[in-house]
Amino acid sequence: MSNNDQKRDEGYIEKLVQVNRVAKTVKGGRIFTFTALTVVGDGKGRVGFGRGKSREVPAAIQKAMEAARRNMIQVDLNGTTLQYAMKSAHGASKVYMQPASEGTGIIAGGAMRAVLEVAGVQNVLAKCYGSTNPVNVVHATFKGLKAMQSPESIAAKRGLTVKEIF
């Protein structure tokens, strides 16, 4: 369960969030496999997460990285922070994220911190409630980031100017 594993490949920042060993009991004993949860981002608003399973740890991590690259979304950031405060949930995990002023840094824990770092968010206040299962926390964080829209995109959808919205 390392959160510090970070590589730069093709302009993407890759982080390993979790490695888990699981066992399947069969007639002859136990079969051990490994699952990996990774997040990938470009540091400019594009971010993705993936899960991989294999009998070997490196193969599971590689599969997770490939899945994360296929599962990328674009996040509308307001400079180095979020557009507005938001709540999101997945399963029993609930996350709350709010924009922070310049120089605050990423105040978030565990899996949520990894997602926000690779997405390019540099100033944010975040809290996780309920279950802290890394898989569900990453899902909840992604739901929140995916739902976030910039005022410009909302104005364009409504056919108004940004000043008319506020």
UniProtKB/Swiss-Prot annotation:
- InterPro entries (alphabetical): Ribosomal_Su5_D2-typ_SF, Ribosomal_uS5, Ribosomal_uS5_bac-type, Ribosomal_uS5_C, Ribosomal_uS5_N, Ribosomal_uS5_N_CS, Ribsml_uS5_D2-typ_fold_subgr
Instruction: Identify the GO cellular component terms for this protein.
Output: small ribosomal subunit
* GO biological process, alphabetically ordered: translation
Q: Which domain of life is it from?
A: Bacteria
Q: Which residues form the signal peptide?
A: none
The record places domain S5 DRBM at 12-75
Q: Does the keyword Glycoprotein apply?
A: no
What does the subunit comment say? Answer: Part of the 30S ribosomal subunit. Contacts proteins S4 and S8.
Q: What does this protein do?
A: With S4 and S12 plays an important role in translational accuracy.
Q: Which HAMAP family match?
A: Ribosomal_uS5_B
What protein name applies here? Small ribosomal subunit protein uS5
- State the encoding gene: rpsE
